[in-house]
């Protein structure tokens, strides 16, 4: 039977408590190991010269190309960018989308440059000629990448144009770094406010961590390389397949972007944009089956001052299929004498 003597209980406490305290002190008073830099995976730049990618999308696809090492924690990420157009031109940033790198602007960027704009293009982390850090591809990762790149090229601000997921990046960038936006933001076939139900079951399955683990295994990668080298689809489809087959972290980067990135949940960014003096343009095709046309109207509901240019029968790749229409709309919008017109424009 336990003693009811209070002095006995005190003596036991005096023996046990210091021991417990010392144990806890040594267990919890030490810091964990120093943070480990993320693993960095290579880009198209490391493929052999025999790879078809060098013919489709070489490093010098645009003039004025260069690399920069951008900081990410304790790591440095190699990023490819291009500056085209006159050095004293009005500055425009073009942000590509989820899977296709800066080649997607091939029929738009030169038009802007020829009309006197200084255009900055770049490959997002994990795409094209930019390395792929093994991290979560969330919105902050992409907005910070652009802010660091603009700092590197010594741009105080610029007009911001985003395509597809790049539209989500443009919206979040405007919210995170409003001082870097020079009064104009354009969204082309823009994502950013899609809901989980708007993403196909197949896309959700393929972007799951389990599937990504399987597809990273050497046998699957070998199969994808053979498939990519044997097939000759359209230009953009081929660069997509080559990235998927040859870049070790491309599929995981795309999957993480789909799960965690600027595809969904950016209503707040568009709402914040509505509270600024920025002029806003939305360009969207009625036949877009990737980011449905309804999202153009939903974005406009969030940003009432936005102009909406509707491209009749335009799909998701309108910078390729309707490049002249997109270029014309952007040139009108970026001009100094642009003024908002309440009635939407429709391009047949």
Enumerate the predicted regions with their spans.
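Active-site loop/oxyanion-hole signature of alpha/beta-hydrolase fold enzymes
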Residues: 59-60, 66-74, 80-82, 114, ...
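Conserved HGGG/HGGXW glycine-rich cap/lid loop of the alpha/beta-hydrolase fold
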Residues: 73-129
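Short beta-strand/loop motif that positions the catalytic acidic residue
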Residues: 276, 282-284, 288
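Conserved alpha/beta-hydrolase catalytic His-Asp/Glu region
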Residues: 196-202, 213-276
């Amino acid at each position: 039977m336990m003693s009811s003597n209070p002095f006995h209980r005190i003596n036991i406490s005096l023996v046990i408590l210091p021991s417990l305290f010392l144990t806890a002190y040594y267990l919890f008073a030490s810091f964990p190991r120093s943070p480990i830099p993320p693993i960095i995976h290579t880009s198209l730049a490391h493929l052999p010269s025999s790879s078809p990618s060098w013919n489709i999308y070489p490093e010098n696809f645009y003039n004025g190309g260069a690399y920069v090492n951008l900081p990410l924690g304790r790591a440095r990420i190699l990023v490819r960018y291009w500056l085209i157009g006159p050095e004293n031109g009005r500055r425009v940033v073009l942000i590509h989308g989820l899977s296709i790198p800066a080649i997607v602007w091939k029929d738009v960027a030169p038009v802007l440059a020829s009309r006197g704009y200084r255009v900055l293009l770049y490959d997002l982390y994990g795409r094209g000629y930019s390395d792929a850090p093994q991290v979560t591809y969330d919105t902050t990762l992409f907005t910070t990448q652009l802010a660091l790149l603009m700092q590197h090229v010594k741009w105080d601000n610029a007009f911001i144009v985003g395509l597809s997921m790049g539209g989500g990046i443009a919206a979040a960038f405007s919210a995170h770094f409003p001082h870097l936006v020079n009064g104009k933001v354009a969204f082309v076939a823009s994502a950013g406010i899609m809901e989980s139900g708007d993403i196909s079951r197949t896309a959700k399955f393929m972007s799951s961590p389990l599937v990504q683990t399987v597809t990273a295994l050497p046998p699957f990668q070998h199969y994808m390389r053979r498939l990519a080298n044997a097939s000759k689809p359209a230009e953009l489809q081929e660069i997509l397949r080559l990235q998927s087959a040859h870049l070790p972290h491309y599929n995981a980067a795309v999957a993480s972007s789909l799960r965690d990135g600027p595809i969904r949940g950016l209503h707040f960014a568009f709402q914040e944009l509505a509270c600024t003096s920025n002029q806003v343009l939305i360009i969207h095709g009625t036949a877009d089956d990737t980011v449905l046309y309804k999202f153009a109207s939903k974005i406009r509901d969030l940003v009432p001052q936005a102009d909406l240019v509707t491209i009749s029968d335009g799909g998701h790749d309108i910078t390729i299929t309707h490049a002249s229409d997109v270029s014309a709309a952007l040139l009108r919008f970026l001009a100094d004498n642009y003024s908002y017109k309440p009635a939407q424009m429709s391009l047949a």
